[in-house]
Amino acid sequence: MFSRFSAFSIVFLILSSFGQVLAQVEFVEDSLRTRELDEVIITATRNERTMGALPMPVSLISNVKIRTMGSLRLNDVLTEQTGLVVVPQVNGQGNGIQLQGLNPEYTLILIDGEPVVGRNTGTLELSRLAVGNIKQIEIVKGPSSSLYGSEALAGVINIITERPSGSKYGFRSRYGSNNTMDLSGDVSYTNKKLGVYVFGNSYSTDGYDLSPENSGNTVSPFDNYTFSSKVTYQLGNRTDLSVAGRFFHEDQRFNFEVLQGNNRIQTSGIGNTQDWNLNPVVTHRFNSRLKAIGRFYATKYKSKTDLSFEADGGSYYNDELSQSFLRPEVNGEYYFNDKNILTVGGGYISESVQTTRYDDGVERFQYTSYGFFQHEWMPFAKWSVILGGRYDRSNIYGSQFSPKLSSQFDLNDKIVLKASVGKGFKAPDFRQVYLNFTNPAAGGYSVLGSAVAAERLAELDANGELLTSLDPSQIGDLEAEESFAINIGANIELLPGLKGDINLFHNQIDNLIETQIVATTVFNQNIFSYRNILRAYTQGLETNLNYPIIKNVKLSVGYQLLFAKDKDVKESVENGEVFYRDQNTLITRRLGSNEYFGLYNRSRHSGNIKLFYSNRQQGWEASARVIYRGKFGIGDISGNIQGETIPPSDRNSNGILDDYDDFVAGYALVNLSVAKSITSGFRFQLGIDNVFDYTEPVFIPNLPGRIMYAGVSYSFSKNGN
């Protein structure tokens, strides 16, 4: 933890550096006002295409911007992007990404086009992923990502890592609040045929405690390390080989006070997480028109947690999870002419999960074979169309076809119109069907899969352990989720240099799977299960503006408006069938149609304002970013977390989220960074995240408060750049 003197020193140095930065700003016309070259995107079509040629909402985050922001982990980067909301897991441990109002399990996270596995409670822990070796992050929103399978209903986030490029090496270190230390280094080597890139990262922290009156930390101390490499080799004039690998390991030390009856008991223990992947890829060009790619991807994720009683050392809690994923795939691209490009491919997935969270602990398997196609067609010079689809067949959910259609029309040099429409599908996963899990370390909450919930609740009720409960007969089998989505947008150059984009989206989901509280124990511990919301939708708009206001200074503004509702509830409200009880007068009233807020954990309004300064000649970089999230409801996580009682959001007990319920208030985070590079290859950086120290210990435990840091890096390349 920084001392007060250290904190004051960093604030003073940042403000002083900003003063030097502003003193060098020239209020003159800048060449950045001219049209910039489009970046290349791979994710949207599985092939390299420029952003300007893609008829669907896409965005790109470069490594230069990541470096200027001072981000260390993937969640730090994504939380500042328009339309992306980082949300905590139900137990307050970990972070997932919400895209277009859809839950984290509907956004596919890829590394170089391959999926990252290991979703606890449906959420992929984003902080597992270091950003030091990232070349760029590509984000594709909406159904145009259907080439990647049914899990990508909301979209795809693809992390493109560095490849071997010349002979160079670098080292980076950073120290900050909560005794957080980050060390990383990379080296690249290439000759005529061989290229090697190696990256390593070590990250450790003491965690943080937002509720010192309770025993234990909000986030316990942990340390992890990442090692990755990529080797490329030219097998012939037309054939290239690439082999990439990654290894991650984390250890965490727990100290919890848990409730057992009316007693508070001290426990402690350790947890570890480990994952690895291997990805060989062969690319062969038969001629100037035909290219084929064969790849094999293997990955495994393991996690284990052991807690013991501090009094006698006896075992209190054990949790283990192991997930494996294997996938061979072949795809080809045929270039007919400038107006027609065809991509076809297919593959096979073998996936297994074994965990103590299932009653029998038996390893369960799922096998899926699939094929996909995509035709890129340009009928006219200003009009392009992409038609594609994917067919999946699984031993669990049978078969499903997911089509997509996207189109773009260049109205003129300043306005480009885009639209995409598609269908998606997601079957209930292992967790939603078989889970039987209790986490005493986070207040004793339990999660039951649909196949075991009714039987387990009947047992608890017979033992007199339930305070309230749904009728077990109301907890039925889950049905597969089906989606239909549409995105309509435009890219517009409003003024020379002033560029904007807007995207209207609508996601219609039938049988949306959501968590619900099905019972509360006599110890005030919640029991969750899963249910299908028969008809739900998320819709709204996203917009961004970018403008180089003065030389070397770029301004960006982003905003999202979101409506997310259960259509059956909406119709009941409109028909006058839903009531609420006024908490002041105790009078029961009919709920108005405009008083139904919608689904939990969705903010109606969110946005960001960012300023970036870059003067390569003088070696200065700086940024000031404001991230806003509007109010949202939290009804699905009432209970005890870290010893604190969370009040239910639905305080008028009508079973929905309306304007008279409790909300988490909207908030804004302010982040600052400044960096100075010198000619010898060194770069120094100072920064403050969450300048005004906003925290919400109960409802938003993934916000650690004010974070101050200082870092230094060194880079060297053989050509002197």
Stretch-by-stretch model annotation:
Residues 114-141, 229:
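Short acidic/polar hinge/loop motifs at secondary-structure boundaries
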Residues 378, 504-509, 526-638:
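Gram-negative outer-membrane beta-barrel transporters
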Residues 228, 317-331, 364, 370-372, ...:
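Outer membrane beta-barrel strand-and-loop segments of large Gram-negative receptors
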Residues 188, 199, 232-234, 593-721:
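Conserved C-terminal beta-signal and adjacent last beta-strands/turns
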Residues 75-118, 135:
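Extracytoplasmic beta-strand/coil segments of soluble accessory domains associated
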Residues 167, 174, 189-273:
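Periplasmic-side early beta-strands and strand-to-turn transitions of outer-membrane beta-barrels
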Residues 39, 74-77, 95-98, 125-130, ...:
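N-terminal periplasmic accessory domains that precede
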Residues 24-67, 104:
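Short, acidic, small-residue-rich periplasmic hinge/interaction motif at the N-terminus
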